[in-house]
Amino acid sequence: MKSMQYHPPTTTLVSEFNKEKYNNSNHYNDNNDNNNNNNNNNNDNNNNDNNNNNNNNNNSIINNESDNESNGTSNNYNDEANDNHHHHQDDEHHGNGNDNDNENYNNQNVNHEKLASIKNKNYNNNESDNESIEEINSNHNNDNNNNTNNNDNSSNNNNNNNNSNNNNNNNSKEINEDKENYNNCDQHHHNHNNNNNNKYNGGSSYNYNSKNCKEYINNLENLLKLSNKENKELYEKIISLGSILNEKKTLLSKYRNVLIDYLEDVHIYDENGNANPNYDNYNNTQQKSIKDFDVGKDLVKSNLNLQFHNYNNKDYNKEYNNNNNGNNNKDYNNNKEYNNINNNNISSNNNNNNNNNNNNNSSNKEYKEKEYKEKEYKEKEFKESKDSSLKRKSSSDDDGDDSGRDTKKYKPGRTVWTLEEEELYKEVFNHYGKNWKKIKTHFPDKSKSQVTSHGQYLIKINKLQDLQKVKSPPTLNITLNDIIEQLKQQQQQQQQQQQQQQQQQQQQQQQQQNNIVINNENTNDNNNHNNNNYNDNNNNSNNNNNFNNSNNNNTNKFIDEDDD
């Protein structure tokens, strides 16, 4: 007898089984008519019971087929129609009970071959059918007896199976072999499963996989929706960030232009504190673009000291000396290696000049000494001229305290003078003249230099007369509050005058409007009168014409009569 080949089901996956239960199970049941797939992962004793049940089910199927054939119905089945009824036993998981299991398996295969041969024939005699069915039933009973023997043997084999259950590596190999068998048989039994599904209206495992596919598709659709939402949000963020970047680029361009304008009058000194004359050839075209522009990269990190054209700075010489002694600073020594690196922002001309300066120290020293001496000479001249202008000449008109005294080097800023203070200043100046000390008593918030400079300014503008100083004048009891009240009164008077003027203007406008109305009425009356006269004249002319016509008619009548 030929042994039936095992065909694994294409609708179930090996990965769905648990490893431990799969290793302990020795029998599979693929019967689609009885939904026993959930019981495939039980112990050996339960699987043997399932085999008994399956054999009984096969007997019931055969009896049903015989009943259908006795009614005159003949069914033709293919050899592959009963592959879903095969029973598989793993001989590798049994120790000493392999012989009994193989006998049961061969007996079952014989029975299934007989079923296939019976179903492929058209029976005309019911008696021969019943005989063959009885033989098959007897064989199934033998199978049941053998299975009971297997139950006894399985209890002995459980001890041997403990080693296989503990070896996880062997189990994983067996599962991989089953997967390979599944992949090899998948294509071969694809059409076979379709035919069986058409006959038996589908199995539970097929429906189970279709549900899983639908759930998987729904999950994918949900993930697509979520990803689309996230993409939209990210796209909106990108747009907003792009607008912010554009705004910042415009601001950077503005700041860059401001810095360029501010750095036009700048001297940059080398590491040794010497000015670089070629850096004055500053060109905007040599600068970086807005993207590569960094405010603190060109000047701050390069440790180049800045000095503006401001000779009024008191600490100029100190800073210059400190720059010459820059090697003593810790920051300089730490950043010496960084300073030796060629900066990309400095032009190639400056790099060449620096190299020439290092090679020709003697010629450069002479040039630098001359330049430094010229700067010192200019600074001295400027300071002397400034000190001489700040010195005050002694005169008999000045007070004793201020005679021959050098004023402080005070740089007056822009002081704010209100209208009230200016009017008070005018009155005080007209009373005291150029006695600045007396004038300052009325302005405690202002300094003496501010008072004098403001008075001289007003004299230049011709808002004040150039009055001389009044000696020992009487004091004025005028304050800002008095002037504020005077100004308020003046403002009130001006407002009253403006109101009166507005009232007069309104009265004039009303009179003009009344005159216009009267003139319009007169013109309307005249026009009406003229129209009436015109109408009367037209009526008179019409009457005259009618009279003339009547006369003409009468004359014509007389003429006609005469002719007759």
From Swiss-Prot:
Residues 82-96, 365-409 have a biased composition (Basic and acidic residues). Pfam families: Myb_DNA-binding. It comes from the Eukaryota. GO terms for biological process: positive regulation of transcription by RNA polymerase II. Keywords: Nucleus. One of its GO terms (molecular function) is transcription coactivator activity. It is found in: Nucleus. Residues 412-464 form the SANT domain. GO terms for cellular component: mediator complex. Residues 23-79, 97-107, 135-173, 193-203, 310-364, 519-556 have a biased composition (Low complexity). Residues 22-107, 122-203, 310-410, 519-564 are annotated as: Disordered. This is Myb-like protein F. The gene is mybF.
